[in-house]
């Protein structure tokens, strides 16, 4: 049996809410075991900046252009892709910064679904109370496919913008609408379909690990995902968010194993 491993790094804003009550089950094939290292920054929010956040990552690339593409560092022997979500001083925010991406990432690190109204988003209006819908596992939503790379609703369905590597190692952006427990997407450039299922109820959060040589605490969180698409590649969608107003950052990696 041969295993292929792809490593992605992500950065996202989230609230460090961890509930270790839910068991992690590995019963089906074609699932990915992902680990996130969640860190809380001790700097004051007003002192934080996008540039200072990149200093927390040891091996980084240049910030991604404003058209939504990102650059990767392939020097790692494990083909690690260190992603830096950047923002030019005069350019717009990364189009992957959406309320729904915040919501999905909060499901990855917490058992309960949270509202995303308390997150300020670059160049985006804060959704009203009639738009902020807490999507519980198993809840049905309608609507599908939205190639516009920013927050939108279709039939009261939040749309997630995400990215995927092609065979030329170029990152392309795609969109998805949530159906039940999964995210269904259809690629813009081909007829291939991709399904990414978020098992928000199957999350294990370990206790906080304190390193006396570090200035922050690290929370290790394990989450079960399902990721399958044509071409034999199992790539985890990158949910990127880079905002320092709350003083929280997430610096970690997603390790995807496929058989």
From Swiss-Prot:
GO terms for molecular function: dioxygenase activity; metal ion binding. Induction: Expression is up-regulated more than 10 fold in toxin producing cultures. Residues 39-66 are annotated as: Disordered. Residues 50-64 have a biased composition (Polar residues). Keywords: Dioxygenase, Iron, Metal-binding, Oxidoreductase, Virulence. Disulfide bonds: none annotated. The keyword Oxidoreductase applies. Pathway: Mycotoxin biosynthesis. The keyword Iron applies. Part of the gene clusters that mediate the biosynthesis of AM-toxins, host-selective toxins (HSTs) causing Alternaria blotch on apple, a worldwide distributed disease. AM-toxins are cyclic depsipeptides containing the 3 residues 2-hydroxy-isovaleric acid (2-HIV), dehydroalanine, L-alanine which are common for all 3 AM-toxins I to III. The fourth precursor is L-alpha-amino-methoxyphenyl-valeric acid (L-Amv) for AM-toxin I, L-alpha-amino-phenyl-valeric acid (L-Apv) for AM-toxin II, and L-alpha-amino-hydroxyphenyl-valeric acid (L-Ahv) for AM-toxin III. Gene clusters encoding host-selective toxins (HSTs) are localized on conditionally dispensable chromosomes (CDCs), also called supernumerary chromosomes, where they are present in multiple copies. The CDCs are not essential for saprophytic growth but controls host-selective pathogenicity. This is AM-toxin biosynthesis protein 11. The lineage of its organism: Eukaryota, Fungi, Dikarya, Ascomycota, Pezizomycotina.
């Amino acid at each position: 049996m041969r295993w292929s491993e792809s490593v992605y790094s992500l950065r996202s804003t989230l609230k460090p809410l961890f509930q270790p009550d839910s068991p992690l089950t590995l019963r089906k094939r074609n699932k990915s075991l992902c680990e996130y290292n969640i860190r809380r920054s001790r700097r004051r929010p007003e002192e934080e900046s996008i540039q200072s956040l990149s200093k927390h990552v040891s091996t980084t690339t240049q910030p991604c252009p404003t058209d939504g593409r990102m650059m990767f560092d392939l020097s790692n022997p494990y083909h690690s892709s260190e992603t830096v979500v950047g923002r030019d001083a005069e350019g717009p925010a990364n189009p992957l910064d959406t309320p729904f991406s915040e919501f999905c990432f909060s499901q990855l690190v917490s058992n309960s679904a949270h509202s995303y109204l308390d997150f300020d988003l670059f160049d985006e209006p804060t959704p009203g109370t009639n738009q902020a819908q807490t999507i519980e596992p198993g809840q049905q939503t309608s609507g599908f496919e939205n190639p516009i790379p920013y927050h939108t609703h279709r039939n009261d369905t939040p749309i997630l913008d995400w990215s995927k590597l092609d065979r030329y190692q170029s990152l392309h952006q795609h969109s998805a609408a949530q159906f039940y427990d999964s995210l269904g997407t259809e690629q813009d450039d081909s007829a291939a379909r991709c399904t990414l299922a978020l098992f928000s109820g199957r999350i294990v959060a370990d206790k906080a690990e304190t390193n006396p040589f570090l200035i922050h605490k690290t929370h290790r969180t394990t989450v079960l995902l399902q990721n399958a698409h044509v071409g034999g590649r199992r790539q985890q969608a990158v949910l990127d968010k880079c905002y320092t107003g709350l003083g929280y950052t997430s610096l970690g990696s997603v390790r995807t194993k496929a058989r």
